[in-house]
Amino acid sequence: MLVITGSNNKVSVSEAVFGREFSEDLVHQVVVAYRNAGRAGTKAQKTRSEVAGTTKKSKKQKGGGARHGALTAPIFVGGGVTFAAKPRSFEQKVNRKMYRAAICAIFSELNRQGRLMIVDAFDLEATKTKDLIEKLKGLDVGKRPLIVTEEASEHLYLSARNLPYVQVRDVQGLDPVALVGADTVVITADAVKKVEEWLA
Protein backbone atom coordinates (compact mmCIF):
# COMPACT_ATOMS: atom_id res chain seq x y z
CA MET A 1 0.00 0.00 0.00
CA LEU A 2 1.29 3.45 -0.93
CA VAL A 3 -0.08 6.75 0.40
CA ILE A 4 -1.48 9.23 -2.10
CA THR A 5 0.22 12.59 -1.61
CA GLY A 6 -2.11 15.33 -0.37
CA SER A 7 -4.72 12.95 1.09
CA ASN A 8 -5.14 10.11 3.59
CA ASN A 9 -6.10 7.67 0.86
CA LYS A 10 -3.94 4.68 0.03
CA VAL A 11 -3.53 2.80 -3.21
CA SER A 12 -2.82 -0.91 -3.36
CA VAL A 13 0.17 -1.71 -5.57
CA SER A 14 1.70 -4.90 -6.89
CA GLU A 15 4.80 -6.15 -5.07
CA ALA A 16 6.03 -7.57 -8.38
CA VAL A 17 6.17 -4.05 -9.84
CA PHE A 18 6.86 -1.75 -6.87
CA GLY A 19 8.57 -4.15 -4.45
CA ARG A 20 11.04 -5.93 -6.66
CA GLU A 21 14.69 -6.46 -5.77
CA PHE A 22 16.99 -3.98 -7.50
CA SER A 23 19.47 -5.37 -10.03
CA GLU A 24 22.04 -2.74 -10.97
CA ASP A 25 23.52 -4.95 -13.72
CA LEU A 26 20.14 -5.45 -15.39
CA VAL A 27 19.17 -1.78 -15.20
CA HIS A 28 22.58 -0.71 -16.53
CA GLN A 29 22.33 -3.12 -19.46
CA VAL A 30 18.84 -1.93 -20.41
CA VAL A 31 19.69 1.78 -20.04
CA VAL A 32 22.84 1.42 -22.18
CA ALA A 33 20.92 -0.55 -24.82
CA TYR A 34 18.14 2.07 -24.87
CA ARG A 35 20.61 4.94 -25.31
CA ASN A 36 22.59 3.06 -27.95
CA ALA A 37 19.40 2.48 -29.96
CA GLY A 38 19.18 6.26 -30.38
CA ARG A 39 22.66 6.57 -31.88
CA ALA A 40 22.84 7.26 -35.60
CA GLY A 41 26.06 5.31 -36.10
CA THR A 42 26.90 7.33 -39.24
CA LYS A 43 30.45 8.31 -38.29
CA ALA A 44 32.81 7.73 -41.25
CA GLN A 45 36.46 8.42 -42.03
CA LYS A 46 38.69 7.49 -44.97
CA THR A 47 41.64 5.13 -44.96
CA ARG A 48 44.80 5.81 -47.01
CA SER A 49 43.31 3.87 -49.91
CA GLU A 50 40.13 5.97 -49.95
CA VAL A 51 41.42 9.56 -49.74
CA ALA A 52 41.85 11.57 -52.94
CA GLY A 53 45.47 11.92 -54.00
CA THR A 54 48.17 10.39 -56.14
CA THR A 55 49.82 7.16 -55.12
CA LYS A 56 53.07 8.25 -56.77
CA LYS A 57 56.12 8.02 -54.53
CA SER A 58 56.59 11.45 -52.95
CA LYS A 59 60.41 11.53 -53.19
CA LYS A 60 63.35 9.36 -54.18
CA GLN A 61 64.14 6.40 -51.97
CA LYS A 62 67.76 7.43 -51.54
CA GLY A 63 69.37 10.75 -50.73
CA GLY A 64 68.71 11.14 -47.01
CA GLY A 65 65.53 11.69 -45.06
CA ALA A 66 62.69 9.33 -44.31
CA ARG A 67 61.71 6.70 -46.86
CA HIS A 68 58.20 7.87 -47.73
CA GLY A 69 55.85 6.36 -50.27
CA ALA A 70 52.52 7.97 -51.19
CA LEU A 71 51.40 11.27 -49.67
CA THR A 72 48.09 9.61 -48.77
CA ALA A 73 49.79 7.88 -45.82
CA PRO A 74 48.33 8.73 -42.38
CA ILE A 75 51.51 10.54 -41.32
CA PHE A 76 50.83 13.40 -43.79
CA VAL A 77 48.27 16.20 -43.53
CA GLY A 78 45.42 15.28 -45.85
CA GLY A 79 46.32 11.60 -45.68
CA GLY A 80 44.05 8.77 -44.60
CA VAL A 81 43.21 7.72 -41.05
CA THR A 82 45.02 4.68 -39.67
CA PHE A 83 42.01 2.98 -38.06
CA ALA A 84 39.21 4.78 -39.88
CA ALA A 85 35.75 4.73 -38.29
CA LYS A 86 32.98 3.25 -40.42
CA PRO A 87 29.19 3.43 -40.14
CA ARG A 88 27.85 0.73 -37.83
CA SER A 89 24.87 -0.17 -35.70
CA PHE A 90 25.19 0.17 -31.92
CA GLU A 91 21.97 -1.75 -31.31
CA GLN A 92 21.98 -4.28 -28.48
CA LYS A 93 19.38 -6.98 -28.12
CA VAL A 94 17.18 -6.67 -25.03
CA ASN A 95 14.18 -8.96 -24.92
CA ARG A 96 10.80 -7.87 -23.59
CA LYS A 97 11.12 -9.78 -20.32
CA MET A 98 14.43 -8.07 -19.46
CA TYR A 99 13.10 -4.63 -20.39
CA ARG A 100 10.02 -4.98 -18.20
CA ALA A 101 12.04 -6.42 -15.32
CA ALA A 102 14.36 -3.39 -15.47
CA ILE A 103 11.43 -0.94 -15.41
CA CYS A 104 9.99 -2.80 -12.38
CA ALA A 105 13.39 -2.68 -10.64
CA ILE A 106 13.66 1.08 -11.25
CA PHE A 107 10.13 1.76 -9.92
CA SER A 108 10.86 -0.40 -6.86
CA GLU A 109 14.11 1.43 -6.11
CA LEU A 110 12.43 4.82 -6.55
CA ASN A 111 9.78 3.69 -4.06
CA ARG A 112 12.39 2.51 -1.53
CA GLN A 113 14.31 5.79 -1.79
CA GLY A 114 11.17 7.90 -1.32
CA ARG A 115 11.44 9.32 -4.84
CA LEU A 116 8.09 7.96 -6.03
CA MET A 117 5.12 10.23 -5.37
CA ILE A 118 1.55 9.16 -6.13
CA VAL A 119 -1.11 11.84 -6.66
CA ASP A 120 -4.86 11.60 -7.33
CA ALA A 121 -4.60 13.60 -10.56
CA PHE A 122 -2.17 15.96 -12.25
CA ASP A 123 -3.61 18.24 -14.88
CA LEU A 124 -3.86 21.92 -15.69
CA GLU A 125 -6.93 23.88 -16.75
CA ALA A 126 -4.90 25.97 -19.20
CA THR A 127 -1.51 26.00 -20.89
CA LYS A 128 0.39 28.09 -18.34
CA THR A 129 3.94 27.37 -17.25
CA LYS A 130 3.44 29.56 -14.18
CA ASP A 131 0.61 27.32 -12.95
CA LEU A 132 2.76 24.22 -13.38
CA ILE A 133 5.66 25.79 -11.47
CA GLU A 134 3.35 26.64 -8.56
CA LYS A 135 1.95 23.12 -8.55
CA LEU A 136 5.42 21.57 -8.48
CA LYS A 137 6.59 23.91 -5.70
CA GLY A 138 3.73 22.64 -3.54
CA LEU A 139 4.87 19.04 -4.02
CA ASP A 140 8.60 19.56 -3.34
CA VAL A 141 9.82 17.35 -6.17
CA GLY A 142 13.42 18.52 -6.56
CA LYS A 143 15.06 19.99 -9.64
CA ARG A 144 14.36 17.20 -12.16
CA PRO A 145 10.84 15.83 -11.74
CA LEU A 146 9.20 13.33 -14.09
CA ILE A 147 5.42 13.59 -14.29
CA VAL A 148 3.66 10.40 -15.39
CA THR A 149 -0.01 10.47 -16.36
CA GLU A 150 -2.33 7.76 -17.67
CA GLU A 151 -2.83 9.55 -20.98
CA ALA A 152 -1.13 12.48 -22.66
CA SER A 153 -2.37 15.90 -21.52
CA GLU A 154 -1.84 18.74 -23.99
CA HIS A 155 -2.04 21.51 -21.35
CA LEU A 156 0.47 19.73 -19.14
CA TYR A 157 2.87 18.88 -21.96
CA LEU A 158 2.88 22.40 -23.43
CA SER A 159 3.25 24.03 -20.00
CA ALA A 160 6.33 21.92 -19.22
CA ARG A 161 7.92 22.31 -22.64
CA ASN A 162 10.01 25.38 -21.76
CA LEU A 163 11.06 24.06 -18.35
CA PRO A 164 14.34 22.33 -19.24
CA TYR A 165 14.46 19.92 -16.29
CA VAL A 166 10.78 18.93 -16.13
CA GLN A 167 9.63 15.93 -18.14
CA VAL A 168 6.06 14.83 -18.83
CA ARG A 169 5.23 11.33 -20.07
CA ASP A 170 2.18 9.17 -20.38
CA VAL A 171 2.55 5.49 -19.41
CA GLN A 172 2.99 4.47 -23.03
CA GLY A 173 5.93 6.88 -23.41
CA LEU A 174 7.87 5.74 -20.33
CA ASP A 175 11.47 4.70 -20.78
CA PRO A 176 14.29 3.64 -18.41
CA VAL A 177 16.47 6.71 -19.08
CA ALA A 178 13.71 9.14 -18.07
CA LEU A 179 12.98 7.16 -14.87
CA VAL A 180 16.63 6.84 -13.83
CA GLY A 181 17.39 10.52 -14.48
CA ALA A 182 14.50 11.93 -12.44
CA ASP A 183 14.92 13.29 -8.91
CA THR A 184 11.29 12.47 -8.20
CA VAL A 185 8.68 10.60 -10.23
CA VAL A 186 5.20 12.05 -9.77
CA ILE A 187 2.66 9.52 -10.99
CA THR A 188 -1.14 9.60 -10.91
CA ALA A 189 -3.15 6.79 -9.28
CA ASP A 190 -4.70 5.91 -12.65
CA ALA A 191 -1.24 5.73 -14.21
CA VAL A 192 -0.13 3.34 -11.44
CA LYS A 193 -2.90 0.92 -12.43
CA LYS A 194 -1.93 1.19 -16.09
CA VAL A 195 1.75 0.57 -15.25
CA GLU A 196 0.74 -2.56 -13.33
CA GLU A 197 -1.34 -3.80 -16.27
CA TRP A 198 1.69 -3.31 -18.51
CA LEU A 199 4.35 -4.83 -16.24
CA ALA A 200 2.59 -7.37 -14.01
From Swiss-Prot:
Belongs to the universal ribosomal protein uL4 family. InterPro entries: Ribosomal_uL4, Ribosomal_uL4-like, Ribosomal_uL4_dom_sf. It comes from Xanthomonas oryzae pv. oryzae (strain KACC10331 / KXO85). The keyword RNA-binding applies. GO terms for cellular component: ribonucleoprotein complex; ribosome. NCBIfam families: rplD_bact. Keywords: Ribonucleoprotein, Ribosomal protein, RNA-binding, rRNA-binding. Residues 43-67 are annotated as: Disordered. One of the primary rRNA binding proteins, this protein initially binds near the 5'-end of the 23S rRNA. It is important during the early stages of 50S assembly. It makes multiple contacts with different domains of the 23S rRNA in the assembled 50S subunit and ribosome. Forms part of the polypeptide exit tunnel. Gene3D superfamilies: 3.40.1370.10. GO terms for molecular function: rRNA binding; structural constituent of ribosome. One of its GO terms (biological process) is translation. It holds the Pfam family Ribosomal_L4. This is Large ribosomal subunit protein uL4. Part of the 50S ribosomal subunit.
